[in-house]
Amino acid sequence: MLTKFHSYETGKAFTECCDCGCNLHDVDIYIINQSFAGNECIFECAMCLQCRERMNEQLSENSRVAMFDFMHDHADMKSRQERLSNNSETEAYIESCITCDKLRSEAKTFTLGAMFSGDQLIKGPFPLIICDDCEAKIAASISDETRKFWDDYIAEHFPGPPSEIDLPNKTKPILI
């Protein structure tokens, strides 16, 4: 079930940052990303916020601006906050794409993002999903430099699929 945000590989809660290896319960905030093709998890990672911010600094300025602009232009956060409260069921946050409202069940692939403090899900902008169509638009907007950085990062930290295969939308999973 998606709302548990556990590792599909181990069936257990994530415990380590995929980048620095720190214990996720020793940091203030961490993010979980899971990419799915249908109901199958094809990529997953948990990353402390410090590593996520450091990674963001490695992306080209043009890519950071393009991704920010895409989210700003397409995600209606005010409407989302009005519709969902911190007391809303987690499923309500992830039933449709944050940027186009395409139902998760209609997406061929999608990426799920969630933010945690300890074992507590932080609700607000997260949790969220981005559908295959919006992932493709984001992927088309990033620079070759950023694409190479992300492809190299996946290949280095996650040997085997998805670093060595073409996914249905011909892009690597995105990091939310």
Model-based region annotation:
Residues 11-42, 62, 92-124:
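Short recognition patches in nucleic-acid-associated and regulatory proteins
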Residues 1-9, 57-91, 140-176:
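Short, intrinsically disordered terminal segments enriched in charged and Pro/Gly residues
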Residues 2-5, 27, 45-47:
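N-terminal alpha-helical interaction blocks
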Residues 28-31, 41-44, 71-75, 120-124, ...:
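Short amphipathic alpha-helical patches
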Residues 83-90, 96, 102-124, 130-133, ...:
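Cys/His-clustered metal-coordination modules, chiefly Zn-binding fingers
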